[in-house]
């Protein structure tokens, strides 16, 4: 820790969530929860974010507003690392999924680069283009450089720029000095230009050649977005689960991977490491298998979302309901209920009983309750909601 002390103070009706003054963080009183609100709500992410600012924001601070991601992106990233360390990989990945969603909402509202000198007021820069996308950029740098190269670069950047102001080029110099890699291509596409890749992916298997062919197109509008060069994780299940890395950089590419048998599952961009939109030729059967068998929670969530767009309503509803009641991770169960809501599914008596007696996570229960908006307002629904209001331990 770089300073002589660290204190936190709660400020009533504070206009921000938190403010990282050197050695004394101000937090809003909205971060204070009573015992009934835990564990459904937590301030851990905010507390970790503001503490991370003591290094990235105070010990080192951005030279200008255009590079504010060096403060906010780093703090958001390190906050997520804390959640991952404290609660596990699935929890950290779900935080990252919400970063992806936040970044894409911001991009839809206003497309702009992360490093942006084109603004009227500094306040307009404080969006998911710098918080969420900045955090995602650091995760992708971690994948490109590897764990050792990434952390040696961050250490070099922190030590060399202690008590100085910085711009993005200073981080890039530390990476080049430490690893010897020229990452012009990475910084240009993710920091100095706006947007994200959109992939259209299909695959087929050649039994005679024992070969899986993956056809990848980048289909983003090249008038507003560049082509992206990125390492992509491919997960294959052909009796055992194997992970491969392919480098996608062209408009249209075909990649061939040896496989002794036809894969039961092929996942492009496994774990959603690259923020992107993905279109595939996966059938309902493919998505059902992925929903049940993908080892990464984000890949199961993606399958649930895609199933909500498919025809074959009853078999899709059955798969989603089975996931909602059996997946090991609460966020996947919650997202499955959200997908059922998009299908305007109606629940049976046993589904209400299952929520009453088996679902232990209040956040998943909340998602189920939200999905009742499409349920007929009969006596069973009214009784269920009344029981929740009267007897449930959660707000």
Predicted regions mapped to residue ranges:
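Alpha-helical repeat scaffolds
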Residues: 349-356, 381-389
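Non-catalytic accessory/interaction domains
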Residues: 52, 148, 161-350, 354, ...
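Hydrophobic alpha-helical and helix-loop surface patches within well-folded domains
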Residues: 1-216, 266
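Alpha-helix C-terminal capping/termination sites
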Residues: 37, 143-144, 306-309, 342, ...
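C-terminal structured domain segments across diverse proteins
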Residues: 23, 329, 360-367, 374-377, ...
